[in-house]
Amino acid sequence: MVFVKSTKSNAYFKRYQVKFRRRRDGKTDYRARIRLINQDKNKYNTPKYRFVVRFTNKDIVAQIVSASIAGDIVKASAYAHELPQYGLTVGLTNYAAAYCTGLLLARRVLKMLEMDDEYEGNVEATGEDFSVEPTDSRRPFRALLDVGLIRTTTGNRVFGALKGALDGGLDIPHSDKRFAGFHKENKQLDAEIHRNYIYGGHVSNYMKLLGEDEPEKLQTHFSAYIKKGVEAESIEELYKKVHAAIRADPNPKKTVKPAPKQHKRYNLKKLTYEERKNKLIERVKALNGAGGDDDDEDDEE
């Protein structure tokens, strides 16, 4: 087959339609968004909530968001940079931290709706799939997973946040195919492997491996862990304490900001008319006083 170079004609450029700016920036998948926010026409003024998870280089953002004509409304949010308040000071962007962030958001939104006692979720994370069961009084809080434009591969951190929200008591439609530990061959989830990821076992295993093979790399790669005194054997207990602390008090903590410093003023303050007038009178008095002293000296001579 002969290779034919595709030429873009005038008709192509005439009919070319530029995509939305946020799609060009790689921020919003409008094809997925329109399917996530479309509400049934017989549900009047009923918001459709999304469980939004986004990752930055140093943080994890989890939000419960509903769409409106005026714009998206954030009902509740949780961030990985809040986890140091619960005892997790290192590794704020891995799979285990994503689980903690999802758990924090779930407990926070249920506490806000006064449903935290009714829907406790899965208190002990075993790695097995969990779905909340509705009670007789109130239905569980339902949200749809919004992953944005990331690649939904098996074991992605976004599914760690999903697992945390599920164990926290939220009702999110899902499948266990993308959790860490799912085997493609036998199409089953290995709960032990998934539990290992939830409690940071993959991190502790790598720390042990580096400690045996490359101690120098361990000092540089896990310098923050070593500085904080976090050892490979204590990581699982650390995450268990963090989960318990999140369930005990998921409310957001108010940060106390220091008072602004009083900077030294280098430019002269603008004087009012009365201040200028008084200053002039003082200068005249000072000059008159100096002139009177000179006259006295002349008389003495």
Swiss-Prot record:
Transmembrane segments: none annotated. One of its GO terms (biological process) is cell division. Disruption phenotype: Moderate reduction in cell number. Slightly pointed leaves and prominent marginal serrations. Delayed leaf growth and abnormal leaf patterning, with the abaxial mesophyll features appearing in the adaxial mesophyll domain. More proximal vein branching in the petiole and reduced number of small veins at later leaf developmental stages. Abnormal inflorescences terminating early and producing several secondary inflorescences. Double mutant ae6-1 as2-101 exhibits an increased number of lotus- and needle-like leaves, rough adaxial surface of expanded leaves. InterPro entries: Rbsml_uL18_euk, Ribosomal_uL18_C_euk. Keywords: Cytoplasm, Developmental protein, Nucleus, Ribonucleoprotein, Ribosomal protein, RNA-binding, rRNA-binding. GO terms for molecular function: 5S rRNA binding; mRNA binding; structural constituent of ribosome. The keyword Cytoplasm applies. Disulfide bonds: none annotated. Coiled coil: none annotated. Belongs to the universal ribosomal protein uL18 family. Component of the ribosome, a large ribonucleoprotein complex responsible for the synthesis of proteins in the cell. The small ribosomal subunit (SSU) binds messenger RNAs (mRNAs) and translates the encoded message by selecting cognate aminoacyl-transfer RNA (tRNA) molecules. The large subunit (LSU) contains the ribosomal catalytic site termed the peptidyl transferase center (PTC), which catalyzes the formation of peptide bonds, thereby polymerizing the amino acids delivered by tRNAs into a polypeptide chain. Component of the large ribosomal subunit (LSU). This is Large ribosomal subunit protein uL18z. It comes from Arabidopsis thaliana (Mouse-ear cress). The gene is RPL5A.
